[in-house]
Amino acid sequence: MSTLEHPLIDRFLDALWLEKGLADNTREAYRNDLQQFNAWLDGRGLRLEGIGRDAILDHLAWRLEQGYKARSTARFLSGLRGFYRYCLRDGLIAEDPTLQVDLPQLGKPLPKSLSEADVEALLAAPEVDDPLGLRDRTMLEVLYACGLRVSELVGLTLEQVNLRQGVVKVFGKGSKERLVPLGEEAIGWLERYLREARGDLLGGRPSDVLFPSLRGEQMTRQTFWHRIKHHAQVAAIGTSISPHTLRHAFATHLLNHGADLRVVQMLLGHSDLSTTQIYTHIARARLQDLHARHHPRG
């Protein structure tokens, strides 16, 4: 039996034809997808009926790097789900490995991003000679260096940042914790901000908030959004911008510089790889160095 062939694939497709009267073209597409997946698994010492969710996610990352479109991957996953439901129903496997794998979203527009030149212009917009401007510059640097959600950024406390190790501890959706590298540029701005500006903003008031407002309190997301829009106007950026735009730029630029999709998923705090797939219109190469070598400001 060649690595492409597998008796379970034929049995599944025959059952599908008998139960649903599947069109010949769809049936052959499913056959090709499943045979290709089986060959991919065989090359890694894995068996079609003995894999878990991680193997499927790894294969999805491989498909994306090979340039497969979202519609093609959606068809592949549809066939794969049907195959494993069939295996589960017949008692051939104990659990369905596709249950926690999301289908790619079709027709969803790409998130707005910025070019690296636009990001540089935005980062340079705040006047850093006063505490407010230095705070804003540092927030923008951290936002771009780490790809944080705005709620994660404004909620940062002093104890979440470790400048010696160069990482920030982030509590994302569902209180999931992740460590994200800061990079040299962001570390430098944080050191200057903590030395020159944060104390002036607090005015002697005790607080563990990393980026306090002028009242010494945690800044709201809406306030930071207005600050970003102001700096975007100063930088003459024509693209409509929001705090999330820099998160998109973080992901897009990392992938454009050769980052691995699974690493970007981890840095963004996405629970599923498919959420990160929308950025892969520019993904081309594997990551050689996790952050410092590939991030534009690493």
From Swiss-Prot:
- GO annotation, cellular component aspect: cytoplasm; Holliday junction resolvase complex
Q: Which GO terms describe its biological process?
A: cell division; chromosome segregation; DNA recombination; DNA transposition; resolution of DNA recombination intermediates
Task: Supply the SUPFAM superfamilies for this chain.
Answer: DNA breaking-rejoining enzymes (SSF56349)
Q: What is its main location?
A: cytoplasm
The Tyr recombinase domain covers which part of the protein?
109-292
Alphabetically list the UniProt keywords.
Cell cycle, Cell division, Chromosome partition, Cytoplasm, DNA integration, DNA recombination, DNA-binding
Keyword hit for Cell division: yes
Q: Which residues form the Core-binding (CB) domain?
A: 3-88
Active-site residues (renumbered): 149, 173, 244, 247, 270, 279 (o-(3'-phospho-dna)-tyrosine intermediate)
Q: Which InterPro entries match?
A: CB (IPR044068), DNA_brk_join_enz (IPR011010), Integrase-like_cat_sf (IPR013762), Integrase_catalytic (IPR002104), Integrase_recombinase_N (IPR010998), Integrase_SAM-like_N (IPR004107), Recomb_XerD (IPR011932), Tyrosine_recombinase_XerC/XerD (IPR023009)
Where is the protein localized?
A: Cytoplasm
Gene Ontology MF term list: DNA binding; tyrosine-based site-specific recombinase activity
What role is this protein assigned?
A: Site-specific tyrosine recombinase, which acts by catalyzing the cutting and rejoining of the recombining DNA molecules. The XerC-XerD complex is essential to convert dimers of the bacterial chromosome into monomers to permit their segregation at cell division. It also contributes to the segregational stability of plasmids.
Q: Which PANTHER family match?
A: PHAGE INTEGRASE-RELATED, TYROSINE RECOMBINASE XERD
Family membership: Belongs to the 'phage' integrase family. XerD subfamily.
The entry describes its oligomerization and partners as: Forms a cyclic heterotetrameric complex composed of two molecules of XerC and two molecules of XerD.
Classification via HAMAP family:
Recomb_XerC_XerD, Recomb_XerD
Q: What is this protein called?
A: Tyrosine recombinase XerD
Which source organism does the UniProt entry give?
Pseudomonas aeruginosa (strain ATCC 15692 / DSM 22644 / CIP 104116 / JCM 14847 / LMG 12228 / 1C / PRS 101 / PAO1)
Q: Which gene encodes it?
A: xerD
